[in-house]
Amino acid sequence: MPDQLNSRVETCYQQAETFFKRTFKRPMVSFQLRGQKAGVAHLHENLLRFNPQLYKENAEDFLRQTVPHEVAHLIAHQLFGGSIQPHGEEWQLIMRGVYELPPNRCHTYAVKRRSVIRYIYRCPCPDSDFPFTAQRHSMVRKGRRYLCRRCREPLVFSGETRTE
């Protein structure tokens, strides 16, 4: 997986060097990115971070659009300095002129939400399900008490969990 992506990063740098007739310092490439972001360019560290899950699910578009998008940030920073806007005209120039791609700010990849476990707590009131997060459930196990707002009785773990 990283070989194709690293190769694409190198190709993007070679394109920029041909276009601008100068060399650029190569970045470190990391696959330590999770969540909704497909990629992040850390300008001062000369580091590119990519989301391996989104890459796996959208490899073709990722290589075509996301990699040049992030490389363009580093190229723009090396050419124009740190006072430019992240998706400003300098970055757009690189996207259009060097990579011949639309300067899209955001990806449209489907991002799966992480499933979350809820711990069901109850009190004597009818229909009294209280779904607790893992953090709140942990607090109860450490001795914290939560009371029902209606009956003022302590909420007790039912032994049930629910995945959302």
Curated annotation (Swiss-Prot):
Transmembrane segments: none
GO BP terms in the entry: response to stress
Cofactor binding note: Binds 1 zinc ion.
A Gene Ontology cellular-component term: cytoplasm
Chain coiled-coil ranges: none
Keyword field: Cytoplasm, Metal-binding, Zinc
Signal peptide: none
Active-site annotation: 70
GO molecular function per UniProt: zinc ion binding
Pfam families: SprT-like (PF10263)
Binding-site residues for Zn(2+), renumbered to this chain: 69, 73
Listed cofactors: Zn(2+)
Localization annotation: Cytoplasm
Residues of the SprT-like domain: 14-156
Family: Belongs to the SprT family.
HAMAP family tied to this protein: SprT
UniProt cross-references to NCBIfam families, sorted A to Z: PRK04860.1 (NF003421)
The protein's name in its UniProt record: Protein SprT
